[in-house]
Swiss-Prot record:
Its main location: membrane. Belongs to the Ca(2+):cation antiporter (CaCA) (TC 2.A.19) family. SLC8 subfamily. Glycans are attached at residues 34, 817. This is Sodium/calcium exchanger 2. The keyword Phosphoprotein applies.
Length: 921
């Protein structure tokens, strides 16, 4: 494209102008000394250079043809190298902007039931940041060039700054969008998500250039008055406020609900008043998307709460998808993959894509892939450091610490374990029994003694006698305690207690509990607790049913689940119904209920498990006695007494025969979601923390790999030849700009301030080089600005938009910001420069004069072509195309050719008017 424009400009320079002036030759330069001279009436470029803001004139000022060619090459190469420098410092500048706009605040959300949760949301509104700092970052060279040109030339209006702003707007509107349309893979399309915001920014973009024409050619032709300049500057915050109101659905949006649809015949978007919308395209919600209330969100509430809930849902969906792809990995292993996946697929800012494009072009590597590799390297030593350190001491404890026995068992055996240590010492540890509800002498035999662990021994057993009786009684328990550890050498001789590291110690559990179960009763059946909290990620929950106060005979115990707020049948849990059979002397059984894991961030549903009446099986004489009723034979007194005792011993339900199970969100899953939300802040990816990190990045060459893997598992490839070439071409700028303060300092503002000063310095050099290049080859500043300077400042944005179009699921980041930045360029770039100059000349009592013809013609031409471009983009939202970007091959190629053609026509007509081949205003 650039070569075509250069050929066109060369032909224009060779053709005779409409005014009939003689064509200049190298040996006889034209009389005007600078463009300000020719701007009043001349149609040819000047061959006589004037001092710039920073660069002096290259003497002698009347060189030969060969010297002119050499100078032109030097100026052009220097200008290109300066553009590379601006791109790299803009990388730092945009990183600072990303850190500033990514600043978060904590919010407390109160739900309907009174519970509160704390989360973090961004302070900066996305639309406001895109139109202010983001637009300033991407358009800083154009804006600063306009300001520096006016201030550096005695507050005289120039052609380079305004021409660059209009030319850059044309390049962004036509070439950048054409590239974005073409690079979308076949069969795919991208739509603008925030269409209301796009309408507002597009309208302001058109209005900005219409307003520019009005103040140049209608209100006060050839003069910019103070009120016109100041009003141009004031339009910038007004534009931001209108875009913010559209994004927040203020004004009439809050009073009227509209349902939008596309007419199948005409493709026109139709709105109708009605119920609250479930899916509105203008809201940025794709057709078929679930409403917030349907997603278990917070419903109506603050925008911050809905934003936080949406972030959580995105992370949860990512974890669900990764679990299906990698069922063999646990949650901790998925965190790293999920972090990379979330960073890769989340909607990114204009700053990120600008930084990504610059680093890929300059051999600095893929931002996300380098971040994932650095995170993996940091995690490896952290995992090793997390392992428990052994102090070398032996640990002595009960294993297990809970024991159950029937009262007719005679004795119970307890186990004591010696674990760890060097194994070359002898340990003496005392034990003794302690009463609980069971009493020594009546329920068990009191015991005390000493256990001796010789070198190499790891386990000892001690036996406690149990006393049996024929009295029906509740279950009872007593304790056995370990105490008084002494250490001996290998021969068993006691060692003095030194002040160094101990060779052994008693650790929990030091106390063993022994429960004596009565064997004179069939048992009381119940759950251990009335309430059981389970995590939804458990899969299957094991519920224990205990048999206390006896364990005689075989008992069958029915059970079933009952719905509460949780629903069975596979919704929240699987229904369970059956029977547990307790054998003789069996005191515990486990039933299982399967929990469905739907991975919700917050959850609290309940259901119940109920026990039925126990049935006594294989009861022997007791069965006969209990089954005998008022038959033909009356029971004897002995049989009546036996029946009464048997009736007392039959199985019954205990107090806890109904268990409430509360299904809650997984604590680990919730922590993982919160951790990922914090990690997916792009400011952590592109920001820097120290000068050391910046200098290491500056001297390191990495592979410029644009293709992303969803799990980041592909091995990092070696840099290509292009990566090495670009790295060595730009290593001077990289090392120089590594001196800029890291983005972590002062929350990014230190980097912001230093970067914009450096960009201003380089922009002043670019302006001088462009002017000297133009006067050397006889190219007017207006044409030079539209072709070369606008192209140089917009190349990084082109690559950034291309990456955004390929990686984002919507078109906002790639083309949605084009219209906003075009408006900001006029309101800030020309508003600031012209306000300063108009006020200066008003104080001097003179008007601020601006040449009307070329600039007014370019503005009008761009406005007409922009109307055509925006209309085509809106037409492409018809169903058969699918969106502003991509679509079927035929419409895609046709639209790309149309936009490129509009840009070439703009260059052609602007150049023809500048050289008087056609009449302007």
């Amino acid at each position: 494209m650039a070569p075509l424009a250069l050929v066109g400009v060369t032909l224009l320079l060779a053709a005779p102008p409409c005014s009939g002036a003689a064509t200049p030759t190298p040996s006889l330069p034209p009389p005007p000394a600078n463009d300000s001279d020719t701007s009043t009436g001349g149609c040819q470029g000047s061959y006589r250079c004037q001092p710039g803001v920073l660069l002096p004139v290259w003497e002698p000022d009347d060189p030969s043809l060969g010297d002119k060619a050499a100078r032109a090459v030097v100026y052009f190469v220097a200008m290109v190298y300066m553009f590379l420098g601006v791109s790299i410092i803009a990388d730092r500048f945009m990183a600072a902007i990303e850190v500033i706009t990514s600043k978060e605040k904590e919010i407390t959300i109160t739900k309907a039931n009174g519970e509160t949760s704390v989360g973090t949301v961004r302070i900066w509104n996305e639309t406001v940041s895109n139109l202010t700092l983001m637009a300033l970052g991407s358009s800083a060279p154009e804006i600063l060039l306009s300001v520096i040109e006016v201030c550096g030339h005695n507050f005289q209006a120039g052609e380079l700054g305004p021409g660059t702003i209009v030319g850059s707007a044309a390049f962004n509107m036509f070439v950048v969008i054409a590239v974005c349309i073409y690079v979308i893979p076949a069969g795919e399309s991208r739509k603008i998500k925030h269409l209301r915001v796009f309408f507002v920014t597009a309208s302001w973009s058109i209005f900005a250039y219409v307003w520019l024409y009005l103040i140049l050619a209608v209100f006060s032709p050839g003069v910019v008055q103070v009120w016109e300049a100041l009003l141009t500057l004031v339009f910038f915050p007004v534009c931001v406020v209108f875009a913010w109101m559209a994004d927040k659905r203020l004004l009439f949006y809050k009073y009227v609900y509209k349902r939008y649809r596309t007419d199948p015949r005409s493709g026109i978007i139709i709105g109708a008043e009605g119920d609250p919308p479930k899916s509105i395209e203008l809201d940025g919600t794709f057709v078929g998307a679930e409403a917030p209330g349907e997603l278990g969100g917070l419903g109506p509430g603050p925008a911050e709460a809905r934003e936080l809930d949406a972030s959580r849902r995105e992370v949860i969906q990512i974890l669900k998808d990764l679990k299906q792809k990698h069922p063999d990995k646990d949650l901790e292993q998925l965190v790293g993959i999920a972090n990379y996946y979330a960073l890769l697929h989340q909607q990114k800012s204009r700053a990120f894509y600008r930084i990504q494009a610059t680093r890929l072009m300059t051999g600095a590597g893929n931002v996300l892939r380098r971040h994932a590799a650095d995170a993996s390297r940091r995690a490896a030593p952290a995992e090793g450091a997390g392992e428990d350190e052994d102090d070398g001491a032996s640990r002595i404890f009960f294993e297990p610490s809970l024991y159950h026995c029937l009262e007719n068992c005679g004795s119970v055996l307890l186990s004591v374990t010696c674990q760890g240590g060097e194994g070359n010492s002898t340990f003496y540890v005392d034990y003794r029994t302690e009463d609980g509800s069971a009493k020594a002498g009546s329920d068990y035999e009191y015991s005390e003694g000493t256990l001796v662990f010789k070198p190499g021994e790891t386990q000892k057993e001690l036996r406690i006698g149990i006393i049996d009786d024929d009295i029906f009684e509740e279950d009872e328990h007593f304790f056995v305690r370990l105490l008084n550890l002494r250490v001996g050498d290998a021969q068993g001789m006691f060692e003095p207690d030194g002040g160094g590291r101990p060779k052994g110690r008693l650790v929990a559990p030091l106390l063993a509990t022994v429960t004596i179960l009565d064997d004179d009763h069939a048992g009381i059946f119940s759950f251990q607790d009335r309430l059981l909290h389970v995590s939804e990620c458990m899969g299957t929950v094991d519920v224990r049913v205990v048999r206390s106060s006896g364990a005689r005979g075989t008992v069958r115990l029915p059970y079933r689940t009952v719905d509460g707020t949780a629903r069975g049948g596979g919704v929240h849990y699987e229904d369970a119904c059956g029977e547990l059979e307790f054998g003789d002397d069996e005191t515990m059984k486990t039933l299982q209920v399967k929990i469905v894991d739907d991975e919700e961030y917050e959850k609290k549903d309940n259901f119940f498990i109920e026990l039925g009446q126990p049935q006594w099986l294989k009861r022997g004489i007791s069965a006969l006695l209990l089954n005998q009723g008022d038959g033909d034979r009356k029971l004897t007194a002995e049989e009546e007494e036996a029946r009464r005792i048997a009736e007392m011993g039959k199985p019954v339900l205990g107090e806890n025969c109904r268990l409430e199970v509360i299904i809650e969100e997984s604590y680990d899953f919730k922590n993982t979601v919160d951790k990922l939300i914090k990690k997916t802040n792009l400011a952590l990816v592109i920001g820097t923390h120290s000068w050391r990190e910046q200098f290491l990045e500056a001297i390191t060459v990495s592979a410029g790999d644009e293709e992303e893997e969803e799990d980041g598992s592909r091995e990092e490839r070696l840099p290509s030849c292009f990566d090495y070439v670009m790295h060595f071409l730009t290593v001077f700028w990289k090392v120089l700009f590594a001196c800029v303060p890291p983005t972590e300092y002062c929350h990014g503002w230190a980097c912001f301030g230093v970067s914009i000063l450096v960009i201003g310095l380089l922009t002043a050099l670019i302006g001088d080089l462009a002017s000297h290049f133009g006067c050397t080859v006889g190219l007017k500043d207006s044409v030079n600005a539209v072709v070369f300077v606008a192209l140089g400042t917009s190349i990084p944005d082109t690559f950034a938009s291309k990456v955004a179009a390929l990686q984002d699921q919507c078109a906002d980041a790639s083309i949605g910001n084009v219209t906003g930045s075009n408006a900001v360029n006029v309101f800030l770039g020309l508003g600031v420069a012209w306000s300063v100059a108009a006020v200066y000349w008003a104080v001097q009592g003179r008007p601020f004069e601006v040449r009307t013809g070329t600039l007014a013609f370019s503005v009008t031409l761009f406005t007409v072509f922009a109307f055509v471009g925006i209309a085509v983009l809106l037409y492409r939202r018809r169903p058969h195309i699918g969106g502003e970007l991509g679509g079927p091959r035929g419409p895609k190629l046709a639209t790309t050719a149309l936009f490129l053609g509009l840009w070439l026509l703009y260059i052609l007509f602007a150049s023809l008017e500048a050289y008087c081949h056609i009449r302007g205003f």
